Design a protein with these regions (language model features):
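Thiol-/selenol-based redox modules, centered on thioredoxin-like
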Residues: 125, 129-176
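A short beta-strand-turn-helix
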Residues: 26-44, 64-69
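Sec-exported extracytoplasmic/periplasmic mature domains
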Residues: 51-54, 67-71, 100-104, 128-132, ...
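A short, compositionally biased
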Residues: 21-26, 141-142
Length: 176
């Protein structure tokens, strides 16, 4: 019996360590126009976005942040998601057109995914679950929640949806 308990504890620890050793860079994502997007050794701000949300004007500030820091080992990656009151109903093509026409978005936009629920994308499982990222549970509260990933692919933290892309927490982290 003691052997069985020891074996179970060992397996649980191994599974836990495996999840904690997983990096952001271990995931594959697809751009809004259907191309593979390599996650590389940059600081990354991951944001779930929506076109018909009260926070949609954050696209402008995200673009400003991207323009200011894109040459300093930093990128923003937007993930359209329709998880909150149907505020991102469009197709990938419609979302891309909206972002370009209304906010001149040039930071990488990925294909539409789910950021919560049973069909949550694996990347967002890692971003939101301590058992996956090894750091903290951080369920997505609403559109425009921001996750910070360091240049080694490690989860650093998150910023609430209503906080500005230029919040002190984000800017300090980028400039470290």
């Amino acid at each position: 019996m003691k052997s069985f308990i020891l074996m179970v504890i060992t397996m649980v620890c191994a599974i836990s360590l495996e999840a904690q050793n997983k990096s952001f860079y271990d995931f594959n994502v697809t751009t809004i126009d259907g191309k593979e997007f390599p996650l590389s050794s940059l600081k990354v701000l991951v944001v779930n976005v929506a076109s018909k949300c009260g926070l949609t004007p954050q696209y402008a500030r995200l673009q400003e942040l991207y323009d200011k820091y894109k040459d300093k080992n930093f990128v923003i990656i937007g993930f359209p998601a329709n998880n909150f009151m149907g505020q991102e109903p469009g197709s990938n093509e419609e979302i891309a057109q909206f972002c370009s026409l209304n906010y001149d978005v040039t930071f990488p936009m990925m294909s539409k995914i789910s950021v919560k629920g049973k069909d949550m994308a694996p990347l967002y499982q890692w971003l939101t679950q301590k058992k996956q990222n090894g750091k903290e549970d951080a369920p997505v509260q609403w559109n425009f929640q921001k996750f910070m990933i360091d240049e080694n692919g490690n989860w650093v933290g998150f910023v609430a949806p209503k906080e500005s892309p230029f919040s002190e927490k984000i800017v300090t982290w980028i400039e470290e």
